[in-house]
Swiss-Prot record:
Stretch list, region Disordered: 214-233, 240-314
GO molecular function, one term: DNA-binding transcription activator activity, RNA polymerase II-specific
Presence of keyword DNA-binding: yes
Role of this protein: Transcriptional regulator which can act as both a transcriptional repressor and activator by binding a ATTA homeodomain core recognition sequence on these target genes. During forebrain development represses WNT1 expression allowing zona limitans intrathalamica formation and thereby ensuring proper anterio-posterior patterning of the diencephalon and formation of the rostral diencephalon. Acts as a direct upstream activator of SHH expression in the rostral diencephalon ventral midline and that in turn SHH maintains its expression.
Name of the featured protein: Homeobox protein SIX3
Species per Swiss-Prot/TrEMBL record: Gallus gallus (Chicken)
Main location: nucleus
Similarity-based family: Belongs to the SIX/Sine oculis homeobox family.
């Protein structure tokens, strides 16, 4: 015995869902049924002058079978089609949705059906409908990840179309700031890209040994930290960039301090020490420059550490 679902028994219902409801089609159906006068095929034409059937009775003879689905059945079909990725079929199913009388309100509130409509709107480029669905219906946390990704990607695509070029990381950051996630698909928790202290400590240890790890070392470190190789590579890349920037800043500060110290000592009539200073504390030009340089190195070394480690690693 071959089992067939109700959808397979009456496929024509999906192609003509509103055929009988259209006034033009209704008149065609009534006309094709005849009025019963002068036609031996009419069921009311027997015995002379029989009464013709009422219009709704004539119409019922030509109507296609009506299928009634509960919201749970519709949601089950939507979930299956969404999981399989058959977006085109999912869209056709939602467009020609046969529902039981009085079930429209429940259909419009069911999360699986609303999520399916959002998926179809996203894949068809109908971003206005997508935003309307996501902003006006509260979704559970299980659906947040997928819906957040669609929200952001839709805004990215609109921004790319408007600017006529692909978006970079900074552009995407600005888009996210301009179009924050609605609270209907977001629990309010701020996402952090900072790693745990244990992970950061392990990454720093490996960085001191080798700032340029090869792919095999990245995979090994990823397993040790629970990160992905891409995250490990990004952390090393960002750390190298911060260290280079800190080193360049240190060099500039050294040069500026050295030049200012030499200019102050070279000025005529400039005392090498104040009258309040004792001879033992009076410093020669060489001593003054060296002390200034030493103080600069101390300050900049602190700056280098804070600039490298105070930021979040992504």
């Amino acid at each position: 015995m071959v089992f067939r679902s109700p959808l397979e028994l009456y496929p024509t219902h999906f192609f003509l869902p509103n055929f009988a409801a259209d006034p033009h089609h209704r008149s065609l159906l009534l006309a094709s049924g005849g009025s019963g006068s002068g036609s031996g095929c009419s069921p009311g034409a027997g015995g002379g002058g029989g009464s013709s059937r009422a219009p709704h009775e004539e119409l019922s003879m030509f109507q296609l079978p009506t299928l009634n689905f509960s919201p749970e059945q519709v949601a089950s079909v939507c979930e299956t089609l969404e999981e399989t990725g058959d977006i085109e079929r999912l869209g056709r199913f939602l467009w020609s949705l046969p529902v039981a009388p009085g079930a429209c309100e429940a259909i419009n509130k069911h999360e699986s059906i609303l999520r399916a409509r959002a998926v179809v709107a996203f894949h068809t480029g109908n971003f206005r409908d997508l935003y309307h669905i996501l902003e006006n219906h509260k979704f559970t946390k299980e659906s947040h990840g997928k819906l957040q990704a669609m929200w952001l990607e839709a805004h990215y695509q609109e921004a790319e179309k408007l600017r006529g070029r692909p978006l970079g990381p900074v552009d995407k950051y600005r888009v996210r700031k301009k179009f924050p996630l609605p609270r209907t698909i977001w629990d309010g928790e701020q996402k952090t890209h900072c790693f745990k202290e244990r992970t950061r400590s392990l990454l720093r240890e490996w960085y001191l040994q080798d700032p340029y790890p090869n792919p095999s070392k990245k995979r090994e470190l990823a397993q040790a930290t629970g990160l992905t190789p891409t995250q490990v590579g990004n952390w090393f890349k960002n750390r190298r960039q911060r260290d280079r920037a800190a080193a360049a800043k240190n060099r500039l500060q050294h040069q500026a301090i050295g030049q200012s110290g030499m200019r102050s000592l070279a000025e005529p009539g400039c005392p090498t020490h104040s009258s309040a200073e004792s001879p033992s504390t009076a410093a020669s030009p060489t001593t003054s420059v060296s002390s200034l340089t030493e103080r600069a190195e101390t300050g900049t070394s602190i700056l280098s550490v804070t600039s490298s480690d105070s930021e979040c690693d992504v």
